[in-house]
Amino acid sequence: MKNYFSLIILISALFAQNVVTESDSLNPISLEGVEVFSSLRQVNEGDLAASAVIFNDELKIMEGQHFSDLLLRVPNLNYAGGSSRPRYFQIRGEGSVSRYADQGPPSPYVGLVLDGMDLSELGMITPLFDMQQVEVLMGVQTSLFGASASSGLINFKTNDPTDEEGGYFMTQFGSYNTYTTGLVYNLPFENGWKLRLVGHSNVSDGYKENVALGNNYSSADKNETSLRAKILKEGDLITQKYTMIYSDFDNGYDNWAPDNNTDNITYSDNPGKDSQESKIFIADYKYDLGEQIVDFNVGISNNETLHSYDSDWGNYDFWVNWEGDDHHDDHGDDHGDDHGDDHDGDDHDDDHGDDDHDDEDHDDFDFQSYDFFDSFERDIDTRTVDLRFRSNTNNNNRVDYVFGIFQSNYEETTDAAGYVFGGSATGLATGYDIISKSFYGELAYNFDNESTLAVGFRREARDIDYFDFDNTGSDFVLDGDWNTSFKVSYEMHPTSNLHWYIYAAEGYHPAGVNQNPYLDMEDKTYDDEIYTDVTTGIRWYTDNIKLSASLFYLEHDGHIFEAVEQLDPQNPNAFAFFKQNADSGYEYGTETNGEFRFSDKLSMGLSLGYMSSEIHFGDHDDHGDEHGDDHDDHGDDHDDHGDDHDGDDHGDDHDDHGDDHDDHDDHGDDHDDHDGHEGHADHGQ
């Protein structure tokens, strides 16, 4: 755990005026003044017909931190830990957990948007410094944002320029040589233009000790820089806003250890990197035509990412001495029950055969060759265009409407080195061109000032072109079908401080083609997954209490899950990913979130999530049989490789290491399910 000391210095235009005053009175909680930026229509939090958690005022005291520090405050929101900062999110148990070089095209379940720019699976560049609002919407949001939000949406809104000149400087010190700084300056001009400049830096050694590199604490360091310039001009007819963002997160990556990081110690002799450099430009135009408003948004981004890691998790000396190491004893204890079950209750030594045979096998193994490293780089260019027509809600219309068209172009090239396609290749050079196009709308009827019925829809198609630059003959073109999503909602205010809503939504996650050219033909494709979401909830608030609670039920038809086959038990990198469809599934649960404010300086938060889920595989139960029981054997043969190695000590000894790779539920305790080496449901964590 890191300890922090913070210092904030306010900068006024005259450098002599006191620009901040505080009142001892308690500022009342209000939902009506909190605009929800991720909604199609302009609504406040108190009128939102969705299960959501919205952060705004509390972000002011978290400016030195990252979005990952908010995650525990959102019920039923999780993330996969296989990166230096969260990239892959799950909401209500549905979401992506990884995307290695050979895992196919991007297919996020939880959309992530920064100032109108889609950064799904690229969201590690989201520090909370100078952030106006963070919105997390739970459940199916495909009518709002398309297939990228089939499980939910995370929306970030940074502060706009203001009319007052001034700014502030923030610095924060912490343990492990953590040093964070931030600078904001706001500058209005006489011609009506306003400029806001923001800079933020965070450096830290990390908190893991690498004993192979001389007790080094910097193998998982963080070097993060974010720069932002925002220009705004508001007119009676046209409002223009331009946002330019540069982020460079150059972080080390040294997370995995055979003992599950029991003491935050790693043994890798070749630590990796987890970095992302992003350049983003966003142009927003708002045309106020009186009865109607026209919004036009254009976004362009370039993102260069690198993910690499020491995939044997150790070093030569570590593996040579692994048999007698204390960590091995602990590891044996951890898995003793499994070995005992597999070997009729014999003790751990008996499970691995006699000592002579163990020593012989141990001596024969070439530890010098047990050295693996994986790396993949991506260059990602995105372009988005969104044109939206909506009624002016300031006119208190009986009927409000929104209609729009949207298109995104996603271009990616990937260069990978290591064991690719389950060890069938040592390198990979590929590319994707993905075009998503949609038209959408929402119609809302306001019965009175207290209740609204709304119907929303979206028609969307996604076309994928895949290029294999190594000419393996695995190029493909997928012309996606048009899919329809809809949402019907009703919300009302039974009393002045109570809000109730209910909605039914249907969405989808798109079909695709598995990238691995060595898969059997029956495993090359998978179909759309259809979602049906029914949610009801309440919001209750007083001057010092805000409480929300919801109940949800979600059904899946053609549930997409990701299978993994470990092809070589002696090589922790020899695994192959592919997606398939289960028959159906469902989940239900509840989400509760609250804030209890005792004073302007003291408050208490509440976050409670509960979920139960079930997947029916039907005809897919024989999937393991079709693949020689490889997938099912992740729970048997690869947990105890006795069948493959006849009880040899190294067969089991290093299969214990393989067990760590194959069964990352243990790693999941520390890292929210590392995704690289286990058989798992893609979004059923």
Predicted regions and their residues:
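Short acidic/polar hinge/loop motifs at secondary-structure boundaries
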Residues: 101-140
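Transmembrane beta-barrel wall of Gram-negative outer-membrane proteins
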Residues: 166-168, 173-204, 208-252, 277-283, ...
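Gram-negative outer-membrane beta-barrel transporters
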Residues: 446-453, 461, 553, 580-630, ...
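Membrane-embedded beta-barrel scaffold of Gram-negative outer-membrane proteins
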Residues: 284-288, 293-311, 493, 499-505, ...
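N-terminal periplasmic accessory domains that precede
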Residues: 33, 70, 88-90, 133-136, ...
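Structural signature of Gram-negative outer-membrane beta-barrels, strongest in the C-terminal barrel
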Residues: 231-237, 389-392, 398-408, 430-556, ...
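N-terminal periplasmic "start-of-domain" segments of outer-membrane beta-barrel proteins
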Residues: 31-62, 87-90, 110
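Extracytoplasmic beta-strand/coil segments of soluble accessory domains associated
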Residues: 68, 72-117
